[in-house]
Every structure is written in C-alpha cells, then in structure tokens.
C-alpha cells in the first residue's frame, strides 16, 4: 500500500499480538516500507527475532499525515525529536530530502538518553549531515564516555540554539519532552500554526473508533 509521511500501520504477528507502528520510510521508496521498532515487549521481541523470508501481516496506512504537499511546501523546516520519536519524522525528513527543491532549509534537533539510544545514527551522519542546506544538532541527556557532542535535554538545547521563527516545526518524542519543547517554541516566538506534533503513542485502532486518541 501507499502511504504519506507521518502515517502508521498495524503490524500483526499471528498468534502473538499486533501493534501500531510509524512507517519510517519515505513514500518515494516504492520497493518496500520500513519500520523502526524498539525491542521492549512480547510483540517487538518477536519482530526482532524474525528472519528474512518470515511472514507477518501489515494493514494500513492509518492516521493523518504531515501536509508535505501543501502547507509545508516551500517552508524552512525544523524537526525536533526525542528517542524513538525520530521514527515518524524520518519518513518526512527523507521525503523532504528526496524532493529537496520543494523546501527551504532543514534543521534537525535530535536527542536521546545516551549515545547508544540514538537511532538511525549511521544515516544521520552519512546522509543527513552531508546534505546541503541541512543542519543536524545531536544531544544526549548525560555525560558519556566517548561522546564529544552536546550534553543536555532537548528542550534546553532548543533554547540554547534559539532558532529563528521563519520555520515550521515538527515535533515528536516522549510526552514530557513534547510539553517542554512546545513551551520552548512559544518562548522563541513560534505561533501555534507553525508547529505540528503527533499523538501516535496513543494510537491503537488507527481509525478513531476505540477512543484512545481522544484528548
């Protein structure tokens, strides 16, 4: 099936369980779809044990997507992610990079608890950091041996950098991080219509019937 950046899909392991996961590949990749799944329970442990050729069921896509074809087009973009929250934004970032001429500058602020928890680090270093017009800011919560980059929480680093408000921000991560990032963006002068975030952590049925996404 085809999807748009920011959408998710239900991944089903027969006889085990099923769960909603963000599709992390760009829609420009027509050959396959990718998921970035952290091993943290029965279903995810099973998915991590799969071998090439094993079969699972996937249905979707579900959820609203980021407006990459209209409201975001031509804009300078600021992506802010924490931990596995980079997963849903990766689809948008790679879509933007695949259609580079349609968008302005790209800033990516990404943090995690430790350097070991930074996902897609190889892609970040070998692709994103080497793309013209893209600036990447990495941070980890605490000092760590071997890490010579920035240390500190994402909301604090956001204030340190002090991004210009001529951007549209897309935010995803732990709820507590999102809360303080949104407050930080407001302090910097970003208006509400300049900020997009996601509620995928509350997603279950994918079609708005179960009510878990109501806030």
List where the protein language model places each region.
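Short glycine/proline-enriched turns and hinge-like loops at secondary-structure junctions
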Residues: 3-5, 70-72, 207-208
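Short cysteine clusters
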Residues: 205, 210-213
């Amino acid at each position: 099936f085809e999807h748009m950046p920011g959408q998710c899909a239900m991944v089903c392991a027969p006889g085990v369980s099923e769960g909603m996961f963000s599709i992390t590949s760009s829609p420009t990749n027509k050959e396959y779809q990718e998921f970035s799944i952290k091993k943290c329970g029965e279903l995810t442990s099973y998915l991590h044990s799969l071998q090439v050729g094993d079969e699972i069921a996937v249905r979707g896509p579900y959820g609203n997507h980021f407006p990459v074809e209209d409201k975001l087009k031509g804009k300078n973009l600021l992506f802010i992610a924490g931990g596995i929250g980079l997963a849903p934004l990766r689809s948008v970032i790679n879509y933007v990079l695949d259609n580079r001429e349609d968008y302005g500058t790209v800033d990516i602020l990404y943090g995690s608890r430790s350097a070991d928890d930074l996902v897609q680090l190889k892609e970040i270093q070998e692709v994103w950091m080497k793309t013209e017009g893209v600036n990447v800011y990495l941070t980890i919560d605490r000092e760590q041996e071997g890490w010579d980059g920035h240390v500190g929480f994402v909301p604090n680093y956001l204030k340190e950098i002090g991004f210009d408000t001529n951007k549209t921000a897309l935010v995803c991560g732990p709820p507590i991080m999102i809360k303080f990032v949104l407050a930080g963006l407001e302090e910097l002068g970003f208006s509400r219509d300049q900020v997009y975030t996601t509620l995928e952590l509350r997603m279950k049925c994918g079609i708005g019937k179960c009510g878990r996404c109501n806030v």
